Amino acid sequence: MQKQEPISNQTQIFRHDARGCFVEAKCDRFHLDRVHLQFVAYDKNRPQGQRYTNNVNIYIPIPEFLVLYQEAASGVLHGRMQQYKTTGQQESLYEHMGGTPASTLARLGKARPDGKSVSRVTKLVAGSRSDYLFVADSGPGDQNEQGLTLLPIGAGWRYP
């Protein structure tokens, strides 16, 4: 009997592909009461195993994610999206901010060369070619007085 290769996406719940990028929901952080969304950009021209060009991991608390799900399932989110498109509003339909403090990165041996924290932001916005666009930003951040890691405007990497 031939040995079966391990499945690399065994924690994947779903995956949505776009041109040169994808987002997947994973169940590997449920024990921490978080939904894990991984946003990935890739280049098909690179050799297999080296195709990822950028990657942002977002961890949303399950209660917050369930509120977003309920808004989507009930049609409230779709109604708000239609209203935003009609009035030309540029606000996010949903936004989640998170990050990792510089002290935690240093303790884990993953400190940034500039010594800063890592900030991660995800937004659900009304799209121009499609109804929705899920966007993730990651980059160097600074902690404010409340302990929130903030991403400076225009800094970081954006998906898609």
Model features per residue range: what roles?
Residues M1-P160:
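Positively charged, low-complexity terminal tracts
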